Amino acid sequence: HGQTDDGMRTLLGFLHFPAVAAQLRERSRVEAPTLHREAPRVLDVIYLSTLDLSRLPATTVGEGALRYLIVADKGEMGVRAVREAVAFGATPVVLYSAQDDSGALQVRLAERHGGFGISLEGSFRESYANPVQIAARIHEVYAERFGSEGAPQALACSALYPGYGPLAENTAAIEHFRHEGIVFVGPMQDVVESAGDKRKFRLLAQSIDDDAVVPGIVLEDDDPMEIVGLIRAAHRAERFSFPGRLKAANGGGGRGQVIVEAPERVPGAVEKVLGEIAANGWDPGVMFEQNIAETIHLEVQVLRDRYGNTRHFGMRDCTEQRASQKIQEEAPPALLRAYPGLTERICELAVRIADEVGYVGACTVELMFKDGHYYLLEMNTRIQVEHPVTEAAHRIRTADGLQPLDLVALQFGIAAGAPIPFAQEDVVATHAAREFRINAESWKPKLKDSRDGKVGMFLPNAGVFDVIELPEERTVIAALAADGVHGIQELGIRFDCGFEPGDTLVNKDPTFGKLIVSVATDEAHAEERYELLRRASIEVLRRLRIEGRQVLSNGQVIEGSRFETNREDHIRVLESDLMRQHGRGPVPDRHVGWVVDMLRRG
């Protein structure tokens, strides 16, 4: 009935009654899969009519009309997005820097599959992070390609996918795209502002669970003397104790924060953080929190569609880090086996937060963990670098059996107006998985790190790839069996890489690939699965061949040189005494700084 014009008018008339609108909204959420399949226009109208779109604006093309995916990321994520677009049935359109990436793998792949590239002028920041240039170039190229009459229709069937690149959490960029008529795959700017701002996230989390945040205060002021006075007053009121941590509300990756050892050091810390806020163009605002040292880093993967269906995919352990950057991730976390029920409690909190802000797309809720207590930190309003480890650890139960989890494909489906096509109970953890960020860098024990003044640091290098070769699963299992290691029922080896042999990595993010190893065990070895994962990962890393030669910053090859990666450093981490204990249960000395501490000790 709703597909006729009279029926549509009747539906819209009912929506003047709030109680009816609420019932219709809930019914559309529950029946979204059926409606999307049988009457997508009706589902679109109900969605657009029953939600307060001044707060939760439309974020999808609707009616499953997504035909062009504009990829706005590069490297391994750009390559993944192009391949997923092709598998989704959409034409890949790749944004690229003419200065740096005209021959990049993601551009070649798009053209190979009937897509096209849109060149941008300037360096990384001037191109990939420039929404004004990007929107203008999209309109220009679409007009050239589809004609002045066809361009608006083609753009209406397009969506821009930011991956985890510089546009992903950029509220000004998201708003600009909205005004330019470009659908953004992910939440709109109002949701990013409320969920991605650490201050607002802290207040929201505190309203749900007062014990789920670190003791501290949120400060909206930008006057240094006022901030110092408020911090000192809160300390006198015993709101927190020292040492503390002063953080910019919009910092990240270890930037915009400083540890404050004692009250007398507050003024210097305030001056430093406010200087970083000004230098980076961040919105003003800081938080002062009690510093909880040597914590475990955990996070929850969440997905939500525009109809209000929210799913979580368990947790990840991202404690292995260097310079506040993750280098290994694990799913599900081995240590949480010692805390029954905690995973579900934390995941339910993350789902409530996503529901509260009206999130649309993929997001991650990050938290610290120590001695059985958790502290929610922030929501990353984008797909994370480490999402493949969650995919490798989970399957989706369907009528046809267990199917792989593909978070990027689900993001595309949501952008096309589709509901999440499975229930929470259909998400099944089947494997233990570990991800290794393969970086163009290696550990140099004699170099002094200017960031902390200590000796020992990872030094990046650039190079041309000659060989990129993965071992076969059966070869690894046979090698393990020969060494007396048994019980692996299924071994997964996956390598997400932004390059092919012959490509050159220069002046780019050192992370050029992600190796994901996963194991499923037979019932007799279920308790040993994390030790089996460790042993399998070592064997895979040893057999992973990445060879090349170093290049200068201009791309000139240094003959006789060897392109260096952190592959051997990953093996050293896995062979450490701490990681041998990790598979059996919580390890007291394991925290976000342990890897660098261990390497520095030699």
Regions found by a protein language model. Give the residues of each.
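Glycine/aspartate-rich loop-and-adjacent alpha/beta segment that forms the canonical ThDP
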Residues: 258
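ATP-dependent carboxylate activation and anion-phosphoryl transfer catalytic cores
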Residues: 12-20, 27-94, 115, 128-129, ...
